[in-house]
Amino acid sequence: MDTPQKITAYTLPPDRDQKARELSRIYFRLTIIGFLYGLFVLWLILRWRLAPKYRDWAERSSAKRFLQAMVFSPLLILTIGVLELPTRIYLHSISRGFGISVQGWSSWSLDWAKGELVAMIVGTIFIMILYAVIRRSPRRWWFYFWLVSLPIGLFIFFVQPLIIDPLFHKFAPLVDKDPELTAALEQMVHRAGEDIPPERMFWMGAAEKSTALNAYVTGIGGSKRIVVWDTTIAKMTTPQIVFVAGHETGHYVLYHIPKQLIFGAAILLVVFYLGYRCIGWMLIRWGNKWGIRGIDDWASLPALLLLLTIFTFVLDPVTNAISRHYEHQADQYGLEVTHGLTPDSGQVAAQAFQALGDVNLADPEPSRLQVFLFYDHPSIPDRIRFCLSYDPWSKGGQGEFVH
C-alpha cells in the first residue's frame, strides 16, 4: 500500500469530483421519488383492493387468526416488494454505473429474494401481534403495540449479526486474515474498556459485491462484534482502520446505542399515535371504497402503512439531527481513543475519511438542505475539518471522553 498523502481538506480528482456531485444530485432526487413512489404503491394496493382479496383468501383458509396472518402477511409483503422493484433496480443500476457496486444481477436478485423472505418472516410476526392488540384494545392499540414491539426489536438487534447478516455476506475470523490488525484493534478496545475479544472480530467479504469501505461494531451483549470489510483492509492502513473502529466503539462507550433506542422508541410512539388518530378518519372516508371493514380488518394494513410512512418521513430530519450529533461525538471519541496509540491521530483520521469519501463518492459540497433532510452523518468535508482541528493535547489539555 502506498504511503498515505497528507490531508489538508477533502478533495477529489476533477473526474471523481464531477461524479460525486452528480451522484449526490441523483440520490437527492431518488430519496424524494422513492418516498413518493412508496406511497403510490400503497395507494395502488388500496385502489386495486388487493388487501381485501388476500384477507378473503386468508379467512377461507382458516378460522384461526394466527393462520390467517400466515397467509395474508406474506402475500401483502411480497406484493409491496414486487411493486417497489423498479426503484430498487434503478438504484442498483446507478450504483453499478458509478462503480460503487460490482454485484451482478443474479447475485443481486438472490439477495433481494433473501431480503423479502426475512421481511415476510419478521413482518408476519409483527402483523400478527399488531392485529391481536387492535382487536383487544381498539382505543389503546398504538400504545400496547409500541410496548410489545420494543423487546422484539431488541431481540432482532441481538440476532442480526448472528443469523441475518450471514445470509448476505461471508464472514471469517479477522485474526486468520490480518493478525496485525486484530492485535491493533485489541489494543484499542482494551483502552476503550469494551469487552470485544479477538474471537468476536470478523473479516467480511464485500469485494464481490461492492467497492465501498466500511468497518463497524454491531450487536449487543454476547453478539457484540467488530466487523471489517475486506475492501477496507485492501485500501486503508491499519491505523486508519483502528480509527474507524474506534469511532464505532465510541457509540457503545458513550451509550449512543441505548440513547438512540430510547429516542427511536419515542419517535415510534409518536408515529403510532398519529397513525391511530388518522386511521379512523381515513377509513370513514374511503374504507368502503377500498373494501376495508374496520381498523381490526387485515385489509386495513396498507392504509395504516401509508400513514406511518408519511409520519416517519416527516420526522426523519429530527432523527437525522440526533444521529449527526452522536456521529460527531463518535468521531471525537475515535480521535481520543487512538491518541497515543497512533502517531498524528488527527491526520490519520482525516486520511481515513478521505479514503471513505473517495471510494464512496461523497459530495464535496452538499447543500445545507440536503444535510438537514437526509444526512444521518456529518458530511465528509466537515468530518475532515474537525479531525484536523481537534487537538486539546497541544494546549496541555486532555480529551473529553478518554483521559
Indicate where each model-derived feature is located.
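Polar-ligand-bearing catalytic/cofactor-coordination segments
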Residues: M1-I295, T309-F313, P317-H403
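N-terminal signal-anchor/signal peptide hydrophobic helix marking the start
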Residues: I295-L304
